[in-house]
Amino acid sequence: MLALQDSPARRFLQGLGSRLARPKAIAVVSAHWETSGGPAVSLATLPATIHDFGGFPRALYEIQYRAPGAPELAEQAAALFEAAGIAVGRSAERGLDHGAW
Protein backbone atom coordinates (compact mmCIF):
# COMPACT_ATOMS: atom_id res chain seq x y z
CA MET A 1 0.00 0.00 0.00
CA LEU A 2 1.71 3.14 -1.28
CA ALA A 3 0.64 5.40 1.58
CA LEU A 4 2.00 3.08 4.28
CA GLN A 5 4.80 0.90 2.92
CA ASP A 6 8.27 1.78 1.71
CA SER A 7 8.67 1.29 -2.04
CA PRO A 8 10.53 2.89 -4.97
CA ALA A 9 7.29 4.57 -6.06
CA ARG A 10 6.69 6.06 -2.61
CA ARG A 11 10.28 7.32 -2.33
CA PHE A 12 9.98 8.90 -5.79
CA LEU A 13 6.76 10.71 -4.87
CA GLN A 14 8.19 11.85 -1.52
CA GLY A 15 11.14 13.48 -3.29
CA LEU A 16 9.17 14.90 -6.19
CA GLY A 17 7.88 17.91 -4.25
CA SER A 18 11.36 19.27 -3.61
CA ARG A 19 12.09 19.20 -7.34
CA LEU A 20 9.00 21.06 -8.50
CA ALA A 21 7.99 24.68 -8.11
CA ARG A 22 5.34 25.08 -5.42
CA PRO A 23 1.97 25.59 -7.14
CA LYS A 24 -0.45 28.30 -6.09
CA ALA A 25 -3.22 25.71 -6.10
CA ILE A 26 -4.06 22.26 -7.41
CA ALA A 27 -7.41 21.48 -9.02
CA VAL A 28 -8.78 18.08 -8.03
CA VAL A 29 -11.71 16.38 -9.73
CA SER A 30 -13.16 13.66 -7.52
CA ALA A 31 -15.72 11.01 -8.37
CA HIS A 32 -16.26 10.56 -4.62
CA TRP A 33 -17.96 13.94 -4.22
CA GLU A 34 -21.45 13.38 -5.55
CA THR A 35 -23.92 16.24 -5.80
CA SER A 36 -27.49 16.27 -7.05
CA GLY A 37 -27.17 19.47 -9.07
CA GLY A 38 -24.01 19.05 -11.14
CA PRO A 39 -20.43 19.97 -10.31
CA ALA A 40 -19.43 21.73 -7.10
CA VAL A 41 -16.35 23.50 -5.78
CA SER A 42 -14.95 23.51 -2.27
CA LEU A 43 -14.57 26.88 -0.56
CA ALA A 44 -12.93 25.38 2.54
CA THR A 45 -9.80 27.21 3.72
CA LEU A 46 -8.44 24.03 5.37
CA PRO A 47 -10.40 21.03 4.09
CA ALA A 48 -10.73 18.11 6.48
CA THR A 49 -9.27 14.72 5.57
CA ILE A 50 -12.12 12.37 4.67
CA HIS A 51 -11.54 8.64 5.13
CA ASP A 52 -14.31 7.43 2.81
CA PHE A 53 -13.26 3.79 2.54
CA GLY A 54 -13.32 0.63 4.59
CA GLY A 55 -11.37 -2.51 5.36
CA PHE A 56 -7.85 -1.06 5.41
CA PRO A 57 -5.14 -1.00 8.10
CA ARG A 58 -5.81 1.36 11.03
CA ALA A 59 -2.74 3.45 10.13
CA LEU A 60 -4.43 4.56 6.90
CA TYR A 61 -7.34 6.03 8.86
CA GLU A 62 -4.91 8.02 10.99
CA ILE A 63 -3.41 9.89 8.03
CA GLN A 64 -4.30 13.58 8.04
CA TYR A 65 -3.67 15.53 4.84
CA ARG A 66 -3.45 19.20 5.83
CA ALA A 67 -3.55 20.88 2.43
CA PRO A 68 -4.73 24.48 2.39
CA GLY A 69 -7.79 25.32 0.34
CA ALA A 70 -7.95 28.15 -2.18
CA PRO A 71 -11.46 29.61 -1.89
CA GLU A 72 -10.72 32.59 -4.13
CA LEU A 73 -9.49 30.34 -6.94
CA ALA A 74 -12.43 27.99 -6.39
CA GLU A 75 -14.77 30.96 -6.88
CA GLN A 76 -12.92 31.85 -10.10
CA ALA A 77 -13.30 28.26 -11.33
CA ALA A 78 -17.00 28.33 -10.48
CA ALA A 79 -17.39 31.59 -12.39
CA LEU A 80 -15.77 30.01 -15.47
CA PHE A 81 -18.22 27.10 -15.32
CA GLU A 82 -21.13 29.48 -14.91
CA ALA A 83 -19.95 31.65 -17.81
CA ALA A 84 -20.12 28.47 -19.92
CA GLY A 85 -23.73 27.91 -18.80
CA ILE A 86 -22.94 25.19 -16.22
CA ALA A 87 -24.49 25.61 -12.77
CA VAL A 88 -21.99 25.05 -9.95
CA GLY A 89 -22.57 24.31 -6.29
CA ARG A 90 -20.33 25.61 -3.52
CA SER A 91 -19.44 24.08 -0.16
CA ALA A 92 -17.21 25.35 2.63
CA GLU A 93 -17.65 22.10 4.58
CA ARG A 94 -16.53 19.45 2.09
CA GLY A 95 -13.11 17.95 2.83
CA LEU A 96 -10.59 16.02 0.74
CA ASP A 97 -11.45 12.39 0.08
CA HIS A 98 -8.88 9.67 -0.52
CA GLY A 99 -8.95 10.37 -4.26
CA ALA A 100 -7.46 13.78 -3.51
CA TRP A 101 -4.96 13.04 -0.76
PLM regions: where:
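A short aromatic-anchored loop/beta-hairpin motif
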Residues: M1-L80, A84
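Internal, conserved structured core segments that host functional sites
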Residues: L73-W101
